[in-house]
Each structure stands twice: as C-alpha cells, then as structure tokens.
A protein has these predicted regions:
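Intrinsically disordered, low-complexity terminal tails
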Residues: 2-3, 8
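PEST-like low-complexity, intrinsically disordered acidic/proline/serine-rich tracts
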Residues: 3, 19-244
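Bacterial N-terminal signal peptides
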Residues: 8-19
Length: 244
C-alpha cells in the first residue's frame, strides 16, 4: 500500500471517529447577504418618543389644544377617524402597523398594513404635476451612492405629523435620506421644513426593523375605527372602557 493511500484511509477513519453517527456536520453561522440598495421586505417602524416640533406661536397653540383634547378623550375630526390614510410624514413617523416595501427601477412603494400606500417616483421630477394637494404628497427619489434621497412636496394640510395631533401646513416640505446599514435595519433621516408652522427645520432619524417571518394581514378600517359615544367622547369599537 502506498504512503499516500495509507494517509488517505487514516484521515477518513479519523473523520468517522470524530463525527457522531446521524449528526449533521457543524456549519459556521453566516449573516445573510444583502444589497444596501435593496429595501424589499417587511419592516416595523417606531413611535416618536418626543413631539418636539419647533412650532411658531399660532401652530404651537393649536398643538397644545389638541394634546389636551387627546388627554381629555375629546373627539378630533382627523382623516384617520374617517378611515382615510394618515398621509405623510405620519406614515414614516408612527408605528402600530408594519409595512412592506416593493422596489423597481421606476418606483419604490411602501404599503402599510392599515392600507396606506406611498409611492416614490424614480424616473421623473416634480415638474408638470397637476394633482393635489395629496395625502402622501409628490415624492421624487434618486440614489446618492447607496443612500436613497427623497424630496416630497404638494402635501395636504389636514393630516398630522405623527399619529393624530401634531398639525402642519400645506407649505411643508419633506426631505429624506434612507439607507440600509445592515441586513435587518433601514434608517430614514427625515427633515421637515414648514415656513408657515415651524420656526426652523426639524430633523429626526427613524429606525425600521426588518421581519422576514412577518406578512401583512388584511385590514378593514371599519372594524377598527373610532366612533362617538352619546356623551360626545370618542372610543374604538370592540375595546373595553378604560377605567378612570
């Protein structure tokens, strides 16, 4: 028997002795490969912990009134209470419902489980727009390296900056820089400028967490909407009264 053949047989015998019968070979754990320009998938946003918008005197007074009305459970006639979309920037600045991102060379689409849909156009500019104002505004995007830069204008003034109480005007302008620093995270740096409501721009970075095991479920707004009780306060169908 040659030396090479003997060494090969010895090595094979060693493998058989060290690998328990019926046990799969151990494999090193590796992080999933990803492209920083590929945003497709299901993500969960996050709630704002501080509503520190730089309001001027007029809009600051309106904001404080809405805050107190919300604390007192007084009805507020916002679009969401009529099963309408929360619009921008609330879609990106609030949590509660996950959203799925679909992507092509022409358009990037954010679809939220509550029915809100945001489309970022990648092949045109704002010129020639004859619609509006719009709940989601007119969003135009382009790539700056691996960062998606989005410019949004032409927004309605009856939506909120977050869930339902923070006002803004139709002059609001949204700029975003969106990037994917790791497989499971997208970061969205949002800059809001509103010369009618703010004294200066407001900047905040939102973290979006990826969930590969999630899928969006059917949502019917009428099953979850607010309604007015006989005493004029608001409630949500199906929820037990909150003790006070």
């Amino acid at each position: 028997m040659s030396i090479i053949k003997a060494l090969a047989l010895a090595a094979a015998a060693g493998l058989l002795l060290t690998a328990p019968l019926g046990q799969p070979e151990a494999r090193a754990k590796t992080k999933p490969a990803y492209s920083p320009r590929d945003f497709t998938g299901v993500y969960e946003g996050e709630f704002l912990t501080k509503l520190d918008f730089p309001y001027n005197e007029r809009y600051g007074a309106l904001f404080r009134k809405r805050q107190q009305d919300d604390i007192d459970n007084k009805p507020y006639d916002d679009p969401a209470s009529h099963c309408l979309t929360s619009g921008m920037p609330a879609m990106m600045l609030s949590a509660g419902y996950p959203f799925e991102i679909f992507q092509s060379g022409r358009q990037i689409t954010f679809t939220k489980e509550n029915g809100s849909v945001r489309r970022i156009q990648m092949k045109r500019g704002h010129e020639g727009l004859d619609d509006g104002p719009l709940y989601m505004g007119d969003a135009i995007g382009h790539w700056d390296g691996d960062v998606l830069v989005v410019d949004t204008v032409n927004l309605r003034g009856d939506t909120s900056l977050e869930r339902r109480i923070a006002p803004h005007s139709t002059a609001m302008h949204i700029k975003e820089r969106i990037w994917r620093p790791s497989y499971g995270v997208i970061l969205d740096e949002v800059t809001l400028t509103d010369p009618e409501a703010f004294t200066k721009p407001w900047v905040h970075t939102v973290k979006l967490t990826r969930h590969d095991e999630w899928e969006l479920k059917e949502f019917v707004c009428d099953n979850n909407r607010y309604f007015l009780k006989p005493d004029g306060t608001s409630a949500i169908r199906g929820l037990a009264p909150v003790p006070r």
